[in-house]
């Protein structure tokens, strides 16, 4: 079992809270297994040292990160790639719980560790992490099956009311992307210029030709959060049967 971006953001408190949930289940069910916990949060002083050394670069059109930005941040995390997951797998972990992670990692790490093509494993992971939005009708809360092969992978929905088409799977390249042909991530980018989407059956699509292009240096994305205000929730109720009716 691999869990990434624990708690939805992957900061240290979210990881620790998720560890607590797992420990509670373990105690209730009397389970025994080896678990690896991977943190992704950085201390502020470490990040500021990297700024001073010129090791932090702007991501796209955003402004340069300043030390004042770091001071105002509550949490700063880095989006890890599959490498820490693979290391945990090699250590014999049965359950891996990680902080902020590149979304495909939970699907690609095991495959890459077993020698499958990195580009195809990551591309399949990018599709699977979005659930069934690549199917017709699309859904973010339904299941997809991915089958990774030597030179391709096949995706198909598990719900009989849905189907994958070459167009619906290819269209996923447009989802939350600035460029549908180049999908950057930790340590490099997926190159989809030569990717092919082949309709195998009414519900199955085979994907091939995707390449992984590593960057000269290994970069990870930093994400931070700062307090901008407070939110108050004030629930109210009434017992008046006339008003309720």
Residue spans of the language-model regions?
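General beta-strand structural signal in soluble alpha/beta enzymes
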Residues: 2-5, 33-38, 96-99, 123, ...
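Gly/Ser/Thr-rich loops at beta-strand to alpha-helix junctions
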Residues: 6-16, 100-106
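Flexible, glycine/proline-enriched loop segments at strand-loop-helix junctions
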Residues: 6-12, 67-77, 113-114
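A glycine- and small-aliphatic-rich helix-loop capping segment at beta-alpha/alpha-beta transitions
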Residues: 16-28, 52-57, 110-121
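Terminal amphipathic helices with adjacent charged low-complexity linkers/tails
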Residues: 21-38, 43
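Acidic, His- and aromatic-enriched active-site or binding-groove loops in soluble protein domains
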Residues: 26-34, 60-67, 116-128
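An acidic, phosphate/nucleotide-engaging active-site surface
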Residues: 43-98
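Small-residue-enriched flexible segments
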Residues: 106-245
């Amino acid at each position: 079992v691999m869990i990434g971006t624990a708690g939805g953001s992957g900061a240290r408190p979210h990881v620790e809270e998720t560890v607590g949930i797992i420990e509670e289940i373990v105690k209730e069910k009397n389970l025994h297994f080896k678990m690896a916990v991977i943190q992704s949060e950085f201390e502020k002083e470490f990040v500021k040292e990297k700024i001073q050394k010129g090791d932090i670069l702007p991501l796209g059109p955003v402004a340069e990160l300043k030390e004042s930005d770091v001071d105002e941040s509550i949490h700063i995390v880095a989006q890890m790639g599959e490498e820490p997951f693979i290391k945990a797998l090699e250590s014999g972990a049965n359950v891996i719980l990680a902080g902020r992670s590149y979304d495909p990692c939970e699907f690609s790490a095991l495959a890459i560790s077993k020698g499958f093509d990195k580009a195809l494993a990551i591309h399949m992971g990018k599709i699977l992490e979005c659930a069934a939005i690549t199917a017709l009708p699309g859904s973010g809360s339904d299941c997809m099956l991915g089958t990774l092969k030597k030179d391709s992978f096949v995706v198909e929905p598990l719900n009989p009311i849905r189907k994958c088409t070459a167009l619906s799977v290819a269209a996923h390249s447009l989802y939350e992307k600035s460029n549908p042909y180049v999908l950057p991530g930790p340590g490099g980018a997926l190159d989809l210029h030569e990717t092919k989407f082949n309709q195998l059956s009414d519900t199955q699509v085979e994907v091939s030709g995707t390449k992984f292009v590593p960057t000269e240096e290994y970069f990870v994305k930093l994400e931070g959060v700062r307090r901008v205000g407070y939110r108050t929730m004030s629930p109210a109720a009434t017992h008046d049967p006339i008003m309720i009716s």
